[in-house]
Amino acid sequence: MSAEAACSDDSFGPWAGATCRGGFDFTLLFEETILSILPSVLVIVVAPIPIIRLAREPPKVRASALDWFKKISSICFITLSAALVGLWARNSTITQTRASTPSAVLTFVLSLVYVLLSTIEHRLSLRPSSVLSFYLGLSVLFDIARTRTLFMLEDATHSAIPPVFASSLALRVVMLLLESTEKRSLLLAKYDNAAPESVGGPYNLGVFYWLSTLFFTGYRKILEIGDLYPLDDELRSTGLAKKMSDAWRKVPDKAAPNVLFATWLKTFSKAMFMPVVPRLFQIGFTYAQPFLITAAIELAATPQTQPYNNNGYGLIGAYILVYSGIAVSVGQYEWRNYRAATMMRGSIIPLVYEKSLILDSCSSATFHPTAALTLVSTDIETITSGLVQIHETWSNLVEIGLAIYLLERQLGAACVMSVGFAIVVMVGTVFLARPTGTHLAAWIQASQVRVIETSKALASIKWLKISGLTDVAFSVIQKLRKQELVVSEKFRYLLGLSLILSICTPILGPLLTFAVFAGIAAHGGSTLTIAKVFTAFSIIVLLNSPLAKIVQALPQISGSIASFQRIQDHLNAEERHDPRSTTTGTSPESNNGSQQTLSDKQATADGDTMISISGKFSWRSETPAPGTGITLVTGSDEGHLADTTPDANGDSRDAPVIDISPRLDIPRGALTLILGPVGCGKSTLLKALLGELSSFDGVIEAKYSGAVTYCDQNPWLPNETVRDIIRGRSATDTSDADSSEKADHDEDWYRVVVSACELQRDMQIWPRGDRTPVGSKGISMSGGQKQRLSIARAVYARRALVILDDVFSGLDANTEDVVFENLLGNSGILRKANMTVVLASSDVRRVPFADKIVLLNQHGQVQHTGTPGDLKQVAELGWADRDLDAQQEKPGKDELNHEHGEYSESAPEKLRRSQTNHGADNNAAVQEVLQAVESQADTARQMGDSAVYKFYVKSAGWLTITIFVIAICVYAFCDSFPSVWLKWWAEANEKNPNSDLGKWLGVYAVLGVGAVAACLIGTWQLFIITINRSGLYFHNLLVETVSRAPMMFHSTTDTGITVNRFSQDLQLIDMELPSAALGVVMALSFGIAQFILVCVSSRYMAALLPFLLAVLYAIQHFYLRTARQLRLLDIEYKAPLYTQLMETISGVVTIRAFRWETQSTEKAIRILDTSQKPSYLLFCVQRWITFAVNMVIMMLAVILIVLTTTLREAIGPGYVGIALSNILAFSATMQATITSWVTLEIALGAVARIRSFSMQVRSEDDEARDGLAKAGLDARLVQPTPETVGERWPSQGRIELDNVTASYPSSGRVLHNITMIIEPGQKVAICGRTGSGKSSLFLSLLGLIAQDSGSITIDSVDLATLPREYLRSQIVAVPQEAYILDGTVRLNADPYHNKETLGSTDPPDSRDEQIIDVLKRVGLWEKIATRGGLDMVIDDKFLSQGQAQLMVLARAMLRRDESRVLLLDEATSSLDEATTTLIDEIVSTWFKDWTVLAIAHKLDAILDYDRVAVLDAGRLVEYDQPRELLQRPTSIFKELYLLSTNQASLSSPDSN
């Protein structure tokens, strides 16, 4: 018989037979149909898709030699294909089949399609053709086999077909190289910034070669954000947000459960489908492994001769193909999964941000200033974790089905035990998934509450420190942290239970399966063989992996869906509906011309009325806190505590806050002054004019369109430079005018505005002028500077309507008068521009300048309207004790300035001292320190720090971690050793079938139970004990660091960065780190055990250990240099996004007034895109290391099969089974190790940040010690004891300042040689213009700014030697801004005596009586008593600004027996006359024997003080009795007093 006859080449095969071509070849028919016709048909069918898609695309590359080479090679391909068609058609000399000619014809047709597709994709696509690259790669691989076959045919030497076919193969190799060549250097200029994955070919993307530049850059240098690749267009948030927003808008029922999740899946179905194909390939390659193990064991049992050696060579090729396929498919599957997750982040966060801009700010049920922060941080991270697990559900079910089928083939009915266990685990997991998701949502909610309270405290840290409330406020936060961990325990219990369920199957499943099989075999006459044992064991390993993944995936998916629902609830929250209507019946917001110019508005407006309002508004009733009877609302308006108090007839929560009847008209081009007592609803009325009161019951008719300028009572200042704040979003204005002319005009206007708002002097002092950042919430600015910046922004915007909410109250008298005159005087720029101004105030001094007066009474009703001359009765009001007639008789400001021109112009200039270079030098020094710290941090960022691991272990406790590690090692041993036990059992069965079953099964059972018990102990130690300990440890460390940090830290560090530590960093430590640590320790333990078994099975493999360790070390070293940096960049660049969100929400009323919603959203999206770059690239490099490690495993598997092929007689099938089954398990273990390790690295980044933060941020006391050492004194601070400071310090209140000089590190010296003595019981007022150093002197007494020289003593105790927090706890200070704790009235009134028992509801009755008495004295008790009394839970939204100030004063009053020094920082600046008088009376009587220092702007109230200190430019220029100073003709205090009281002349103090 001839070889051709023995080959059966015309049959499908695929094997050609043992006697055909050495027994190692395919049949010709198989090769021509499967290896030729099938790929050709697929390409011909698929090719039209990219051709149609690219048809309308513009050209993207310029002409090049590459294009010509492709065309030449395509023509050669057509020629050779045509030649092969002719040769096969006329062939009579070589063996052929019925598919030979069709195969050649299809190849020729394909060559024609190839030319068209290659040309189009080269010109119109950024990347190489995926279709052609895949085809050419497969074609080359397949045609190598076909070429071998053709040359091995007996009659091949007489035919031209083999050489022509070989030439075609060689040509396709060249074509593959040409088609795979990337075109970045050929791209047109506008595509130069295309992302690497946008221009990468399939092979580049498949092996992640496109990341190599990033890796080398990160290895060589410290990565900066500019070094990272640009985002792929598909990942840019602008397009993603629009796509998702459009889809969400079309959803009919937005309240349906989980409809947001369903909508997102539908909208981004393509992105979610992309991982499906690589996942299917991964399943195929994975489940090829049991067949390879079976073939290898069978090969090991054969002699080392031909043809068995050929089988071994084929097996080597199969192992290369399968394990390489696993590496590529796993990498591509995970990469595409995380691309989808990145798209989710880019599409959902803008939705949350945009919704936050339109929420109803007057409803707490729908709005909280920082609630959205948790949604875009914790919830988004939770969604990401769950989203990447979605494909694990269906794919693992497929894997489980395949494993069960394969297991049944090996063990028959005995597989029921594994199947049964799988069903039990799946049912249990599904049963646990919902409560797990629910408890995770509860944990996130508890975390949100804590983060909100933390953000609030950090935003007011200055006022907390001044008040000595730092410990109290942060102890509330620490209590919330403990509650959060208690809430999280339920979730952690369920997570641990799910884990135990998942490990029971791989441990107990095989035990019961083999036990049942052994029982059946004993009665059926069969037995366990080595091949059957290890094939079944490998299948069970494969069965366990998807089971474990499902158990892990379902809770994560459930948590992801719960977080989607939380975001959905936010998106469904009640929106603000503008109740205003224009004269055409539409809302002012309907006009898109938010940048309409002033002249345009005036030209289109009609009549003399700008806006009209009539109706009522009541704060809507929300669900009150139990027993409080009080409504939670949001807004900075006054009066809604006072005005919603139940009256005698019952609950009046729906009583109107404002009642405007009859109609109130705001005249156009005039100044309308709204007057009224504290808490009367002035701010609420302004909110109504802005359209902020959605539930306003009445009519608001706006006879204008477009934006309004608005200054809130509490200025909204984002953390930007002074210049950017003043210019606002005006840079985005569009105009037909020449841009350079417009820029010049804007610059001229900018200078005018700066001058009008008296900011030029401040800019000269600030180290960077108008480029100086203001800090979070303007923390680095004084109160007056913040107000003037807010006013300047409003003026700069040049809108027709200007609404000002008590904006002059924070300014000193001189500055207030000058700014008011510059803006609203007879020649003021707002007057000249004929702007309509509405000013709310409690100060009647501005009455003479108003065109219209609106007088509100205490119940929010319009008591009177008219001109200043009509309001004689205002003098009869209890809240305005000034004589209005006298006010109206005062000269205008022009006259005042003229008469006192010597002071307003010359006197201040004489007093101004040129600032030294101290500030600049200090600033440079700070920069050097910061650069040094940054350099140190950068080194750690790149190289890593093993101390971080020790730091985390320390937080949990060494004993806890030791028990955990030992337990996991025991678990690994008990779970790995059964493979050896099974080998011994199978070998024993070959000698004595089915004997000693009790021994074999008994030991197996002991190992299984031991594994479960050890895992249970380890899980408990980690998930319960470790999280509780480390969670409290790291939070307390952050609290301690932040609360003790100096003010300089808070003024220069963005609040969002610090909040990020309390939110994302702690979330990573709580949620990610323990699971990742468990995965890493488990995987390492199992990996070591499995590799030991592999080495025991094949001693030659042990020789690879040094090589393996070296390769793995090199990979991780190369990877970590970049990954660590990306991890930290990811965390760092998420902080600005959180800051932007917090700033936007806190200033949403201002943003909506100015119509800056679009600009704010665009800015947020830019920040989001920046944060996406390190986040996405971190995901990518993690996929790279997964791919790299899988390739290492491929090499190990190939080496092992090579050893099996060449040394199989020495190894034996038993050890081959152990080695290969453990290589299979080792592969899964290494994948798990990498997955857990990269997560652990991210989480440990949070630990490293906290560690670095706690080490680098020095405490106030540390800086105090440095100051003492610098002065040559003992650097130890005094420990406050009766022996060191006295029994009750300060007991007298004598204050002495001796040559005190102080400075801020960032802005230079602020106090110069201040010397003054204040005797016990004296009352001293500190006055001066804004920025003169009043607040700096105040802060120096509290140890909040650095003292360069001199000393401050109180009762002979040097303040520099005292711990800073102790100092502030002993001095009673009332700050300029009040801080209201979220808690009961009792806690707020008397927080200092609740430190040890926060939350206690049963304090002594006597103390309650004292609290009530004090609240009565300040006028708050009547409003509180009917709402729950001292047990009423309040927050900062329940009190108007004035009422909150009274609450702070009540705190001070309750400390009457604890100190003798009272500091008042402009405590009455925002109060009406009656309330100011009340506070003055309390200070003079309640604190009669105290030493009082008061910063004052209202100078008529301090004439009875003992002394007045006048500061200017940080120098003490006058210090004497106020009435004595008023007698001096050249007294600066006299000039300030005249301006403060609007008096043109002053004959004697007694006349006032």
UniProtKB/Swiss-Prot annotation:
List of residues binding ATP: 676-683, 1328-1335
Locations listed in the record: Cell membrane
Compositional bias per record (Basic and acidic residues), positions renumbered to this chain: 887-912
Disulfide cysteine pairs (residue numbers): none
Pfam families: ABC_membrane, ABC_tran, TMD0_ABC
Induction field: Expression is positively regulated by the leucinostatins biosynthesis cluster-specific transcription regulator lcsF.
Domain ABC transmembrane type-1 residues, every copy: 280-559, 963-1241
Polar residues biased stretches: 581-602
Domain ABC transporter: 639-884, 1295-1538
Principal cellular location given in the protein's record: membrane
Alphabetized GO MF terms: ABC-type transporter activity; ATP binding; ATP hydrolysis activity
Membrane topology: Multi-pass membrane protein
Region spans: Disordered: 573-655, 887-917
Record-annotated membrane-spanning stretches: 32-52, 68-88, 100-120, 158-178, 280-300, 311-331, 413-433, 457-477, 500-520, 528-548, 957-977, 1005-1025, 1076-1096, 1100-1120, 1184-1204, 1210-1230
Keyword Protease: no
PROSITE patterns per record: ABC_TM1F, ABC_TRANSPORTER_1, ABC_TRANSPORTER_2
Keywords: ATP-binding, Cell membrane, Glycoprotein, Membrane, Nucleotide-binding, Repeat, Transmembrane, Transmembrane helix, Transport
Source taxon at top rank: Eukaryota
Glycosylation sites (chain numbering): N91, N592, N719, N834, N1028, N1299, N1313
A cellular component term, taken from the record's GO annotations: plasma membrane
Role description: ABC multidrug transporter; part of the gene cluster that mediates the biosynthesis of the lipopeptide antibiotics leucinostatins that show extensive biological activities, including antimalarial, antiviral, antibacterial, antifungal, and antitumor activities, as well as phytotoxic. May be involved in the efflux of leucinostatins.
Similarity annotation: Belongs to the ABC transporter superfamily. ABCC family. Conjugate transporter (TC 3.A.1.208) subfamily.
PANTHER family with a match to the protein in the record: ABC TRANSPORTER ATNG, ATP-BINDING CASSETTE SUB-FAMILY C
UniProt protein name: ABC multidrug transporter lscH
Naturally occurring in which organism (per UniProt): Purpureocillium lilacinum
Taxonomic lineage: Eukaryota, Fungi, Dikarya, Ascomycota, Pezizomycotina
Gene name per UniProt: lcsH
